[in-house]
Amino acid sequence: MQLEFIAHATFLLRLDSGRSIVIDPYKAHEFNGRFDYPTFAPLCDFAVITHEHIDHAWLGDLRGNPVVVRQAWCDRELRISSVFAYHDAFGGTKFGGYVLMKVIEADGQRLCHLGDVGEPLSDAQIAALGHCDVAIVPIGGFYTIDAHAAHALATRLAARTTIPCHFKTPLCTLPSADATPFLRLAGTYTHLPHATYPIDSLPPGIVLLDDAFNP
């Protein structure tokens, strides 16, 4: 399985068979110019959605008539499951309900994407996510857990590689922090340029990936 960071919380996975999976596709040029990523219109086989906000669940630009997975999917090659969490620390009342964090298993690899998780996770939720080769964790705060909560969560998940997402960039000036507070807490991390990476080639620890649009 290969992974490419597109932008915000959107990732593109490519399986060894050639099938492709988009996680949390966004709608371009939203929020009155504060979310100014360009259109992303991949040809894909699956669109995996953690929750129904426009920066995570826009299907209008996807090509190839993908299967949309909101809860679960299983076939001979691919297994996708969901773990419930709230979008905020107030039982989902502040930022629109819940997210279904995703676990994707294929090609002998296991990846979790936590969507816009906004609450500390229980031991039961951590156990349901299980041990992952890669954990994709939001870090920006305001709409999601903040840097301190994200660092604590990454430590508890203990994935081989943790990839931060959902933070402020030159093209996303929504009210969240940039990656700096999280990276300071991490202490050591690897910064990689935008590319498609085999999951088993990613270094261990915190890995900051450049997205497709921010230099």
Where are these regions (language model features)?
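Conserved acidic residues
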Residues: 45, 133, 160
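Active-site-proximal loop/helix segments of hydrolase catalytic cores
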Residues: 90-157
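Pre-active-site segment of Zn-dependent metallo-hydrolases
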Residues: 12-48, 56-70, 84-97, 117-128
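Binuclear metal-ion centers of metallo-dependent hydrolases, dominated by the metallo-beta-lactamase
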Residues: 4, 96, 157, 161-215
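Zn-dependent metallo-beta-lactamase
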Residues: 1-17, 27, 34, 79-83, ...
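Metallo-beta-lactamase
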Residues: 59-108, 185-203, 209-210
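Active-site environment of divalent metal-dependent phosphoester hydrolases
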Residues: 28-32, 52-58, 119-122, 142-146, ...
